[in-house]
Amino acid sequence: MAKHPVPKKKTSKARRDARRSHHALTPPTLVPCPECKAMKPPHTVCPECGYYAGRKVLEV
């Protein structure tokens, strides 16, 4: 019967939690559209009014 590796010591809560410190989710970055004030991702065309950088680029 094949033996498989097992942990020699129990992982502490501090070590376990430190390993998971990068797992947190970040909320999406949103900025108000200067034209219609709807929230949108930065550096993207506004899905509500179709403006980007002060001019109409998308017909909505």
Curated annotation (Swiss-Prot):
Q: What is the lineage of its organism?
A: Bacteria, Thermotogati, Deinococcota, Deinococci, Thermales
Q: Name one GO cellular component term.
A: large ribosomal subunit
Task: Report a single Gene Ontology molecular function.
Answer: structural constituent of ribosome
Keyword terms, alphabetized:
Ribonucleoprotein, Ribosomal protein
Q: Does the record's keyword annotation contain Glycosyltransferase? A: no
Q: Which GO terms describe its biological process?
A: translation
Described function = Found on the solvent side of the large subunit.
The Basic residues compositionally biased stretches are 1-23
Q: What is this protein called?
A: Large ribosomal subunit protein bL32
The similarity annotation says: Belongs to the bacterial ribosomal protein bL32 family.
**Record note on quaternary structure:** Part of the 50S ribosomal subunit.
Query: What's the source species for this entry?
Result: Thermus thermophilus (strain ATCC 27634 / DSM 579 / HB8)
Could you list the residue ranges that cross the membrane?
none
